Curated annotation (Swiss-Prot):
GO terms for molecular function: ATP binding; DNA binding; DNA topoisomerase activity; DNA topoisomerase type II (double strand cut, ATP-hydrolyzing) activity; metal ion binding; ribonucleoprotein complex binding. Coiled coil: none annotated. InterPro entries: DNA_Topoisomerase_II, DTHCT, HATPase_C_sf, Ribosomal_Su5_D2-typ_SF, Ribsml_uS5_D2-typ_fold_subgr, Topo_IIA, Topo_IIA-like_dom_sf, Topo_IIA_A/C_ab. SMART domains: TOP2c, TOP4c. The modification Phosphoserine is found at residues 1224, 1324, 1328, 1330, 1332, 1346, 1363, 1387, 1400, 1411, 1428, 1439, 1441, 1448, 1453, 1460, 1509, 1511, 1513, 1537, 1539, 1563, 1568, 1600. This is DNA topoisomerase 2-beta. The modification Phosphotyrosine is found at residues 1358, 1408, 1596.
Amino acid sequence: MAKSSLAGADGALTWVNNAAKKEELETSNKNDSSKKLSVERVYQKKTQLEHILLRPDTYIGSVEPLTQLMWVYDEDVGMNCREVTFVPGLYKIFDEILVNAADNKQRDKNMTCIKVSIDPESNIISIWNNGKGIPVVEHKVEKVYVPALIFGQLLTSSNYDDDEKKVTGGRNGYGAKLCNIFSTKFTVETACKEYKHSFKQTWMNNMMKTSEAKIKHFDGEDYTCITFQPDLAKFKMEKLDKDIVALMTRRAYDLAGSCKGVKVMFNGKKLPVNGFRSYVDLYVKDKLDETGVALKVIHELANERWDVCLTLSEKGFQQISFVNSIATTKGGRHVDYVVDQVVGKLIEVVKKKNKAGVSVKPFQVKNHIWVFINCLIENPTFDSQTKENMTLQPKSFGSKCQLSEKFFKAASNCGIVESILNWVKFKAQTQLNKKCSSVKYSKIKGIPKLDDANDAGGKHSLECTLILTEGDSAKSLAVSGLGVIGRDRYGVFPLRGKILNVREASHKQIMENAEINNIIKIVGLQYKKSYDDAESLKTLRYGKIMIMTDQDQDGSHIKGLLINFIHHNWPSLLKHGFLEEFITPIVKASKNKQELSFYSIPEFDEWKKHIENQKAWKIKYYKGLGTSTAKEAKEYFADMERHRILFRYAGPEDDAAITLAFSKKKIDDRKEWLTNFMEDRRQRRLHGLPEQFLYGTATKHLTYNDFINKELILFSNSDNERSIPSLVDGFKPGQRKVLFTCFKRNDKREVKVAQLAGSVAEMSAYHHGEQALMMTIVNLAQNFVGSNNINLLQPIGQFGTRLHGGKDAASPRYIFTMLSSLARLLFPAVDDNLLKFLYDDNQRVEPEWYIPIIPMVLINGAEGIGTGWACKLPNYDAREIVNNVRRMLDGLDPHPMLPNYKNFKGTIQELGQNQYAVSGEIFVVDRNTVEITELPVRTWTQVYKEQVLEPMLNGTDKTPALISDYKEYHTDTTVKFVVKMTEEKLAQAEAAGLHKVFKLQTTLTCNSMVLFDHMGCLKKYETVQDILKEFFDLRLSYYGLRKEWLVGMLGAESTKLNNQARFILEKIQGKITIENRSKKDLIQMLVQRGYESDPVRAWKEAQEKAAEEEDTQNQHDDSSSDSGTPSGPDFNYILNMSLWSLTKEKVEELIKQRDTKGREVNDLKRKSPSDLWKEDLAAFVEELDKVEAQEREDILAGMSGKAIKGKVGKPKVKKLQLEETMPSPYGRRIVPEITAMKADASRKLLKKKKGDPDTPVVKVEFDEEFSGTPVEGTGEETLTPSAPVNKGPKPKREKKEPGTRVRKTPTSAGKPNAKKVKKRNPWSDDESKSESDLEETEPVVIPRDSLLRRAAAERPKYTFDFSEEEEEDADDDDDNNDLEELKVKASPITNDGEDEFVPSDGLDKDEYAFSPGKSKATPEKSSHDKKSQDFGNLFSFPSYSQKSEDDSAKFDSNEEDTASVFTPSFGLKQTDKVPSKTVAAKKGKPPSDTAPKAKRAPKQKKVVETVNSDSDSEFGIPKKTTTPKGKGRGAKKRKASGSENEGDYNPGRKPSKTASKKPKKTSFDQDSDVDIFPSDFTSEPPALPRTGRARKEVKYFAESDEEEDVDFAMFN
């Protein structure tokens, strides 16, 4: 039973097994069919060793053969770059062992040798190095010897501590192990003296089998040797071939060059490499650049970690670099780091030398560089184990490579720059050639306005001529003429103005210039093609170019530019007669049917001299081709022989002439060329010789040399005349024409600018565009800061502001202008009789120059670029110049002057000869706020905002944001930026210099003071004094001529009146009877009785003859009577008198006129030319005061609010937001710093002057609150110990004290700061600065006392009888004189100086007085000297120490224009009253100087009364000045540079002479209460008393609208 059970069980098992086998068989069949692997077979795990062998490219790179260009070392040719086939993996395992050997040098500086041995036959490579060996000791953790650990076990290394900064090549712990794994045999030998053992062990079969380590005792020198046999099968190689050996050899050389202090032996031989520089020679040896010169290598050892060599590359960018001895063949960040520096410097040089070429980008510069770099970098990183590309960021390099300027300079001279420039030229030429067609087309399209010749581009193309005309109108003329000669062989193309000077144009300009490209296309020219032979000429569409331009100087310039265009690109064409010109008459003279044509003005002038009866000829001027009619055009072309002038090439002198005229390199030669021309012209004029001219009747051809030297030079000279002003009047011709027209029109009402422009073109023969003329008019009227110091035209409308530098002017159609009242005072009408007027088109136009009373070229500056010369002169202060003129009239030398711009509040300091620093104004308001209240001259507000503040606010790619916000509070005349920044950044900015950070300093260089002198010759002036002296001599001589003219004219007038009076008296007495007598008898009777023929007419005719004026033909005969022939006696002036002349009143009037005229003549004879000049100056200064006072009033217009009655009847003025536009009174002024360079310039300047005491001290800034009195006579502004203002009690900031808010107003040397004198600075603080720098040993005193006033008032007004009818007006002249005198006396001397004056410590001994009283008290010489010296200062912002004490108190700091006519009604003792300007002017004497001066009271009295006073008390004292003594413009002056606390500037503080300080009284309209002033200046709550201040704040009540110049400084 059991058995059977068992048997059954066996059977069942058998069945199951069979079934399983069957199923397995089926499954197996299925698997075979689908080849499906098991999960275990799909997902496998390998050991790291297996993985390395299976995927070697992850570790050592590809194990496939690779063919590429590599630098290798071949025994026969040395280092060379060739195509090699190698296995990167094999190369890498060799390199790993090699780099390990080099790394040992970083561990042991005593290592000196590496031996490399390669045996290709036995496939054995050995690398040995001395130096510290591997420690032969057992690793306590891994329990194996260290050499076995690091060479036989993966992921072992000594480089895993990243906190340790290492400069080795090993990093990941793979290198040597990889070599072991890919070797059939790998043996390590090392000896360690420290552990006194040597170690040797061998691994085989790809590091799978290891022999026993052999450890022996050792006491020799340390070494390490690795010997291995690469598993060539793994690299699909059979043996070490030539290519891989050459590559390994190069690596041995690499080591020799990159491993400093290590000699490398290769196969037993020492490699001949001595350092990195020697290694580089292996590459560049015997290599030449494109010019055949050996490559020049620039080498610099920047530091111990960076060694750089640089040379020219002709194969694009190349680099050989090593990082810790690893050859980074693909470069990396270290290469970029060095190359970027080099490229940055080179591109600067290239751009300088390639301004006109193709723009060059950095990568293009890089393509010409070959750089060699050997560097040590801490813990470098790479993008793969192959270590070909270093990826570490430069900030982690552990060192910096700062290449020297010497290196960069050498780099720019080693051929790289030249190579880049050659490439640029090649690229430019390639681009230009694309513009040309190499195919000759008979028809071309796409060129508008071309009338092509029918035969152009065909077989007769060489016989075709292209006529290039000046504009469309000239084309019409040419087309009219083609009707005569036909269209088959002539084409016409109009030019749009002047073409480009291709010789100096940039590549971009040439590429984009449509005119040039069109000419090339029409003619069929090709760049770089030489047209030397007939065959090349046949490729052209036209065989000639005919130039047809106007016969004026601009037409000559167009001809010259076309000649230059052809000569520069295709010089050979000039030799083939390719160019010719078509000339037309410039003047035609016709008489009956006879007609003469003249082709040059000199030829016409010569004809006029020899022709009789010129008036019989009709003269017509042809200013352009458009003047000719179509009929005349046909006549011209019909006589082609006469009108076509061929250009002939005469030889090298032609090439030289063309180059001279148009090459940028010939600037100096052009100057000499033009100078010689001007001198020759001057000599010709002196000797009466005719001008040279080219186009005579026989002229058929012309050489290029003659064209350049006789025709084109006229344009160059006229270009200078149009661009460079005259020294005499400071005008360019266009400006002179405008003034001439305005004088001639003598408008009493304003006129539209556009209408005036048309009038100028009509009256003065202006031949250029009206738009330019209108801009000239606008510029003459502008008066914003940086434009004119004296605008000769009035800006009635929007003529532009400092916001946009005048570009915001309204259209000329909408704005009006008229002559300024100063114009005729600067250019007296009487001088017009002495001028030489020019003629244009037979029309009398403007004079050669006007002769102003002061050099206007200095007042308003000048700027212009001509041919060969350029001119640049800054503005100077008019009053300073007047002062210097007066000094010169008195026989003294003029004071030096600094540039000065009207209403500019910044500073201008001299740095050297004609070099100045111009600084704006900036104040620190609090810890995070600065306030910019002035910009450098001609830095326009909007431009500054966009180019400086916006980038500072938003930051740029290179610089982070510096400021956090800014606000604008400007007006059209003032600047105010309130800038917010963090406290830290403000501190940093202040440390660096706020002026520098905010770009508030510019330099002004005036080394091009080139002007036309009175002879019409260009002359360069070295100093402003030279200009002034030359002007002075000329002007003084003209005053002599004026006197002669006036004596003659007035004498003739006197004789005329005398004869008339005598005739009337004799008639009344019955001695003469005229009734019923013939005219002939009357004339004979008058002759017999000794009456003279019209003396005025006779004198005029004598003048004309004496002057030998060429325009006599233009003078019509004034003889309108038949009393006699023109040559006979003329008694019309007697016989034409009316019967009214016989009345008693008229007789008395006539006798009075006669006597008055006689006195005028006698007075004039007694005066010297100097006296006449002084009279003119006095009148000018007087009017200047009025004009500037009016300007201030206009600026303040509308700023006052309406008075509103309060509860107690006190008018309260609606407070306006003025404070936001005014500088903060709490700011700390920052003094501009002089840079080291500027300071050096200053020192040189002072040394040059050899310690001359008169030498001004160059100061960067003049402290506003500078209250010390400059030491008199030193020229330096020094604080003297006696300056009581600094030490005395400080008055409280007076609330709402108009006019005392001072912008930085430097004081002038030699002037007390405290006195609030008649502050005459219309210009601005910088004027005072300039003057203070100018001061010499004597303080300059402006003679503006009452004597001067009287001189101005009594300035005679001469009247002349220019017509018979003038007799009746003679009486009016005297009346006018009286009125004028009254006017002058009555008009107060208004203070135009907006700037506050610095408080004065005291009055100079010759303080300037406007009254004779003070003058008398002053010694004559002292008075004279000082007056002269400080004349400019009187009118400049500095306070005037030269005024009398009384006068000094006359003017409020800023309200001076009209404040002076009112007297303070409060807080003044009677003794404090100050005479007004009016009184001084009328009476000529102020209160005695000895009048007791009120002492400064401990407290100011009646403050409240004064403020509340609504009475007319302010008018109680007849027109006395309102400014209390000591309250100068500086009274409320802002603190400068924080040198003293805000109370230090003591407006009320007077030196010992002035013991009292009167409260400043401002005269304002009752409607404008002091509240209109910013609270900054008037702190609402009364200021707390400060130490030393004894007075309470004074509130002022405004009395008059006129007096609103509250605080004029804030507007200027």
